[in-house]
A protein has these predicted regions:
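P-loop NTPase motor domains
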Residues: 1-220
Length: 220
């Protein structure tokens, strides 16, 4: 995270194997982008924003080609659904995308979340979009968008061969710690799965974690 242009790329979407993984990703993102000690007076906005994000992630996971399954595309979809005029009742390009999905697969899990998000008035929907955009605003940066567009880490291989993975966090900037939190969570999940379901209970190569300031810098 110190020099993103020199880093190996990491795309969390690559490690989504089932619906539970999608839920865990969204939950972890919201948790890790919430300042420590803060408490929302009205959880409605975060809950609704998470439903919108779940709809978008599920859509990409099941409907988009692999090269479009990333946070950069999430930002494109969010912009495509932006409500500029609360009096304009015409469907947005994002609405039309989900309308097409409803025609072909009305029971799609992405639609279930999109319907839940879309049940409010235009003013409410606009506020929900703003809430989600605020959570994801770092992905507007070209450096972070590029870092997370593809994946070069191959996390399960850490338990199969000798390799060292360094996650370097700036000492004076916690802006991108949320991505490291997601990385840790997905790494644990991948290694647990590989040990339990592929290698008979233990990894071929033991994995050791040296995590300085882990409790202070990340949330799982």
């Amino acid at each position: 995270m110190i020099s993103m242009e020199k880093s190996h790329c990491y795309n969390p979407f690559v490690y989504l194997q089932n619906d539970n993984d999608v839920q865990k990703l969204v939950t972890n993102l919201f948790k890790s982008t919430t300042p420590k000690g803060s408490q929302s007076q009205d959880p409605f906005w975060d809950t609704s924003a998470s439903m919108l994000l779940l709809a978008l992630v599920f859509y990409l996971h099941y409907e988009a080609p692999e090269d479009e399954q990333n946070f950069a595309m999430i930002m494109e979809m969010l912009r495509a659904g932006a409500i500029e005029d609360e009096e304009d009742t015409r469907p947005s390009p994002l609405d039309e995308l989900f309308a097409e999905l409803e025609m072909s697969n009305p029971d799609h899990i992405a639609l279930k979340y999109y319907r839940s998000y879309h049940s409010g008035a235009a003013k409410t929907l606009k506020s929900i979009q703003i809430t989600l955009a605020a959570r994801l605003e770092k992905f507007n940066l070209e450096s972070l968008a590029s870092l997370t567009t593809t994946d070069e880490l191959d996390l399960p291989s850490l338990g199969e061969k000798k390799v060292a993975l360094f996650a370097l966090i700036p000492d004076n900037d916690s802006s991108f710690n949320f991505l490291v939190s997601i990385l840790y969570t997905q790494l644990f999940q991948q290694l647990f799965y590989a040990a339990d379901h592929i290698h008979g209970g233990s990894l071929p190569v033991p994995v050791h974690f040296l995590m300085d300031e882990f409790a202070n810098e990340t949330q799982l």
